[in-house]
Regions:
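Conserved donor-binding/catalytic core segment of Leloir-type glycosyltransferases
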Residues: 15, 194-210, 216-219, 232
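A conserved, positively charged/aromatic
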Residues: 113, 127-146
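Nucleotide-activated donor-binding/catalytic signature segment of Leloir-type glycosyltransferases, i.e.
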Residues: 235, 244-272, 276
Length: 296
């Protein structure tokens, strides 16, 4: 880990990650982080470096200074050179294995090795049992980062116990929530046609590894005691499985609900909901099942 770098007073920050309007949880996080930085210090110059999947083009906001074509190794070297000549004081990287190119997202190492500025990395997935490629990439990220930021104490423990990261090089900053006006839960449930029912909900982009199948398999036991229990699964399928196999994953979830005889209790909302549209169903639910990888 890069222990020797002293981070100077910050005047110029670059934030790297996927970026809206790309439909990705990291993109939303990057957007929220940028907004928080701007609100914290009007004099701070904060720009975004956006990771773009090669199959799509996006109408990015003006603060996106550069795009990295995530499947092109040379694009990462270009980004490092761009940031070096931009004289940024800090690079904040949002890391998820799947948004960087190469095996286990190894192209990020091209960027890290070329950067001059201090690096603060937020790993959005902290794997307790990485495979060899994931371990190699994570070790490289740790080596080049001045600080690692995780959103849960479990992530800190994994970094310490599995990756031998010293405590003083880890910051735990809990994930924020939107500051919004109060929405009456009873009214929200009424609008969804679920008045007087206890609502279980999962939202976010769907894909293997988030345990949705496990939740669906639990529904038969739940409805024995709560026959009118609705389980709402909100979100479009993640673009990566869509690219590789179309809607096979979502179809498998629907088939599983049919097989278990609980299709009447499970409601799929098959679209990506922006924050404003998500607030009402979130207010209506009694129990939210979080679907992120443990340790994030």
């Amino acid at each position: 880990m890069n222990h020797s770098v002293i981070i100077p007073p910050l005047k110029r920050i670059a934030v790297m990650g996927t970026c809206v309007p790309r439909q990705c949880g990291i993109a939303t996080f990057t957007n929220d982080l940028q907004q928080a930085l701007k609100n914290s210090d009007p004099d701070l110059c904060s720009t975004t470096i956006a990771l773009t999947d090669d199959a799509n083009t996006y109408a990015y906001p003006p603060d996106v200074a550069l795009e990295i074509q995530q499947a092109t190794p040379a694009s990462y070297a270009v980004a490092a050179d761009f940031l070096n000549v931009s004289n940024v004081d800090l690079v904040s990287i949002q890391h998820e294995f799947g948004i960087f190119g190469g095996e286990a997202g190894e192209y990020i190492l091209v960027l890290l090795r070329g950067l001059n500025a201090p690096i603060v990395t937020t790993p959005h997935t902290v794997l307790a049992t990485p495979n060899a490629a994931q371990r190699r990439v994570m070790d490289g990220i740790i080596e080049h980062s001045s600080r690692l930021v995780v959103m849960a104490d479990k992530g800190r423990r994994i970094l310490q116990d599995v990756y031998d990261v010293p405590t003083e090089h880890i910051a735990v900053i809990p994930h924020g929530v939107p500051d919004r006006a109060f929405i009456d839960p009873a009214m929200a449930k009424h609008k969804l046609g679920l008045a007087d029912r206890t609502l279980l909900m999962t939202f976010g982009l769907l894909g293997p590894g988030k345990g949705i199948e496990t939740a669906i398999r639990a529904v038969p036991a739940l409805v024995r005691d709560h026959p009118n229990l609705p389980y709402m699964i909100v979100g479009a399928t993640h673009p990566n499985p869509i690219r590789d196999e179309g809607e096979r994953y979502r179809d498998s979830l629907v088939a599983l609900a049919d097989e278990l005889g609980v299709s009447e209790n499970i409601r799929f909302v098959h679209r990506y909901l922006p924050l404003a549209a998500l607030l009402a169903p979130a207010a209506a639910c009694h129990l939210h099942r979080h679907s992120a990888v443990p340790g994030t």
